[in-house]
Curated annotation (Swiss-Prot):
GO terms for molecular function: transcription coregulator activity. It comes from Drosophila melanogaster. Belongs to the Mediator complex subunit 10 family. Keywords: Activator, Nucleus, Transcription, Transcription regulation. The keyword Transcription regulation applies. Component of the Mediator complex. Interacts with MED4 and MED21. This is Mediator of RNA polymerase II transcription subunit 10. PANTHER family: MEDIATOR OF RNA POLYMERASE II TRANSCRIPTION SUBUNIT 10. It holds the Pfam family Med10.
Length: 133
């Protein structure tokens, strides 16, 4: 992974950790924890600023809309998107492979039946096309 992406990943991990800590503080808020909460919120803002600075270094990264809508918004691991894409590609590959095999069998059967029905013409065809049978 390139350095800008590693920096972004590090900043995002720190941001997520800050949000997690803020959530813990807020869920059991006590007045004496106000200073810690303020520090965490300031750290969160600083983290967002750092992430914004890294934006220009990773502009060429394309993230499909489905990752946000179908995975992140649905509380799923975004890395499952890649797994699902590979599984869909494998399924489509198997489907196409089946069609190709079916067409090969059809070609073989068609040539055999044509040879039975039109032997002279098929001999001429075989002489013309060496790869036909």
């Amino acid at each position: 992974m390139s350095a800008p992406l590693e920096n972004l990943e590090t900043q995002l991990e720190m941001f997520i950790e800050n949000v997690r800590q803020i959530r813990i503080i807020v869920s059991d808020f006590q007045p004496q924890g106000q200073n810690v909460l303020n520090q965490k919120i300031n750290s969160l803002v600083t983290g967002l600023q750092e992430i914004d600075k890294l934006r220009s270094q990773v502009q060429d990264v394309y993230v499909p809309f489905e990752v946000f809508f179908d995975y992140i918004d649905q509380d799923k691991n975004p890395q499952l998107y890649t797994k699902d894409c590979v599984e869909k590609a494998l399924a489509k590959n198997e489907e196409v492979k089946g069609k190709i095999e079916g067409l090969k069998k059809f070609k073989t059967n068609l040539l055999l039946e044509l040879y039975k029905t039109f032997p002279n013409e098929m001999n001429n065809y075989r002489a013309y096309r060496k790869d036909s049978m």
